């Protein structure tokens, strides 16, 4: 029988912005609010977190900030999907190196992949990442 990799309720966080970029004080408040109320995991840089509109560097900076703030209290699941398999692999590896406990990987959204292509995409990311992939 398989073991559950995550249990309970995970919250997909928004990424707050100001006109100058990510609003890190507001992000910390959001995290504290969720942690104080007993969430079991946080999901960062997913669809709700504006990942598709953020640069690679912005995504990594947000993932690193969330991992630091959470400080091991709950699992951090990092959105590391990308339209390009190589980019998804690189972002996944970097997110794991930053301390992410799991990865949220979206289906490539621009090119229409075959079923075989999708399996190859997800397998390549999962094999490279060494953490659970959702």
Annotate the PLM regions.
Residues 2-134:
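Active-site beta->alpha loop and helix N-cap motifs at the rims of alpha/beta catalytic domains
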């Amino acid at each position: 029988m398989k073991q559950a990799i995550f249990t309970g309720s995970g919250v997909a966080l928004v990424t707050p912005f100001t006109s100058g970029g990510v609003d890190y004080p507001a992000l910390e408040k959001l995290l504290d609010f969720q942690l104080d109320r007993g969430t079991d995991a946080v999901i960062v840089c997913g669809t709700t977190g504006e990942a598709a509109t953020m640069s690679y560097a912005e995504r990594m900076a947000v993932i690193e900030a969330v991992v630091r703030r959470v400080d091991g209290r709950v699992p951090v699941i990092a959105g590391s999907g990308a339209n390009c398999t190589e980019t998804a692999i690189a972002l996944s590896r970097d997110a794991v190196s930053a301390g992410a406990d799991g990865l949220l990987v979206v289906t490539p959204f621009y090119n229409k992949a075959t079923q075989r292509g999708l399996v190859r995409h997800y397998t390549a990311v999962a094999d490279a990442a060494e953490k659970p992939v959702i």
